[in-house]
């Protein structure tokens, strides 16, 4: 018999994404969000869910754009800092020593040191409740060449992304267990 855990947002794992925006004055800001994912393949889209109280929320509404910078595990402390400190009062880039880079496609910055970047224009804003879902159409994905495989796709073992868990901890991604759309054919 399974135990009822109640109606809660305790999905076992979510990606750790760093959302990049500019404020009204053009100051670059980043915020870590663990509520995000892919939501459409045509047009290619991702979503991030943010509370209205965040500085990033207002920046996205104002600028209609954001980036997703995917940190590797060696940047876990910086990614956590980006999520626990407001950009209203501090310059997160200055404090962490990381570098804001201007996107050439959207009105938002990304983190130069992070190996994978997704550049998005806001396609739709969905008010749900405490959180608002920002759906961003992907304009481009940029990656450092050292995290790509032979097919020119991100290699998760080279990328070393961070995942967030329901018990409020960060984790590394483990080894692959099989090829998608293939291992099921063995049944």
Regions found by a protein language model. Give the residues of each.
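Basic, polyanion-binding surface patches
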Residues: 1-187
């Amino acid at each position: 018999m399974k135990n009822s855990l109640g109606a809660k947002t305790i999905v076992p794992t979510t990606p750790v994404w760093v959302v990049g925006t500019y404020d009204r004055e053009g100051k670059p800001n980043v915020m870590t969000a663990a509520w995000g994912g892919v939501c459409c393949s045509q047009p290619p889209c991702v979503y991030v869910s943010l509370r209205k109280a965040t500085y990033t929320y207002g920046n996205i509404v104002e600028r209609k754009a954001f980036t997703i910078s995917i940190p590797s595990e060696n940047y876990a402390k910086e990614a956590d800092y980006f999520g626990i400190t407001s950009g209203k009062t501090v310059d997160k880039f200055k404090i962490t020593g990381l570098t804001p880079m201007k996107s050439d496609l959207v009105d938002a910055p990304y983190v130069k040191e992070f190996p994978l970047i997704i550049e998005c224009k806001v396609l739709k804003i969905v008010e749900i409740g405490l959180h608002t879902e920002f759906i961003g159409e992907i304009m481009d994905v940029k990656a450092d060449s050292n995290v790509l495989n032979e097919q020119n796709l991100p290699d998760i073992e080279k990328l070393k992304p961070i995942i967030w868990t329901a018990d409020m901890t960060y984790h590394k991604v483990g080894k692959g267990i099989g090829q998608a759309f293939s291992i099921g054919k063995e049944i």
